[in-house]
From Swiss-Prot:
Pathway: Metabolic intermediate biosynthesis; chorismate biosynthesis; chorismate from D-erythrose 4-phosphate and phosphoenolpyruvate: step 4/7. This is Shikimate dehydrogenase (NADP(+)). Belongs to the shikimate dehydrogenase family. The gene is aroE. The keyword Cytoplasm does not apply. The active site is at residue 73. Homodimer.
């Protein structure tokens, strides 16, 4: 039986459109139950054009904070009263918290999730060991590039079909980042310590990325931010080439950890195997 929600229950959640598929409530509520914390985490689906109104209604302290997903990450950043350096660098917020005085604080934990997943599933990998290639030039790519630069990557190669978009992302972080057209992916992969897919290609049966992963060094790590399916065509190709791989579910869990700390003032309990719970849920949703 779930514990009752009381006047002391700490409420947090995730806001997106759509959001019914989100695994965040499963992850956070499992941690809450394991830790014995009087808290709850729920999903919200605000109208796509009324997110600011939705957030303003929460400034009075109704909830502790929100994780923010598509399509609200950029607007969440724009309406915040205080913006963290991580969110500013990523040009997007995936975490907002509400202060007692009504202020909204914006942060971005995607980079924490990215680096945490790489460290967990590719032990020994280091951001500062060599160039890293990032596929895509959207919000997820911006967050990845910012995190990699902050972690000491000597060069980040942004590979995108539309070169101008890659150039815009590269320009935001300076000379460490370089833009590459998609048809030059093989050159971008040469010598890379990691190749990271920050696009939605391969999600839920959509076409996967057709890129020359065989151009990567044998020691390279290949990561996909997509977690449904867990092993995307991109990761399957990497595994066929005997490259180490990192999946998007691990990133989701790792980026949730600092959010849990911000909402509930505690670290996620080590004994809660939220990955196993999430995998079971994903298997149940498989077509």
């Amino acid at each position: 039986m779930k514990p009752p929600i009381t006047g002391r229950t700490v409420v947090a959640g995730v806001a997106g459109q759509p959001v019914a598929h989100s695994l965040s409530p499963l992850i956070h509520n499992a941690w809450l139950a394991a830790a014995g914390i009087d808290g709850v985490y729920v999903a919200f689906a605000p109208d796509a054009d009324r997110f600011e109104v939705f957030v303003d209604g929460l400034r009075g302290g109704a909830i502790r904070g929100l994780n923010v997903t598509i399509p609200f990450k950029e607007v969440a950043l724009s309406i915040a009263d205080v913006v963290s350096p991580r969110a500013e660098a990523a040009a997007a917020a995936n975490l907002i918290t509400f202060e007692a005085d009504g202020r909204v604080l914006a942060d971005n934990t995607d980079g924490v999730g990215l680096l945490g997943a790489l460290q967990a599933q590719a032990p020994g990998w280091r951001a500062d060991a060599g160039p890293v290639a990032v596929l895509g030039a959207g919000g997820a790519a911006r967050g990845a590039v910012a995190a990699l630069v902050a972690a000491g990557a000597p060069q980040v190669r942004i590979v995108n079909r539309t070169l101008a978009k890659a150039e815009a992302v590269a320009g935001a972080v300076g000379r460490i980042a370089v833009a590459c057209p998609l048809d030059a992916a093989a050159q971008a992969f040469e010598g890379a310590t990691a190749v990271i897919n920050a696009t939605s290609a391969g999600l839920s049966g959509s076409p996967g990325l057709d890129v020359p992963l065989e151009a990567t060094p044998e020691t390279a790590v290949v990561m996909d931010m997509v977690y449904k399916p867990l092993v995307t065509p991109f990761l399957q190709r990497a595994q066929d080439l005997r490259r180490r791989t990192v999946d998007g579910l691990e990133m989701l869990i790792r980026q949730a950890e600092p959010s849990f700390q911000a909402f509930y003032g505690a670290n996620p309990p080590a004994g809660a195997d939220v990955r196993a719970l999430a995998l079971k849920t994903l298997e149940g949703r498989a077509p």
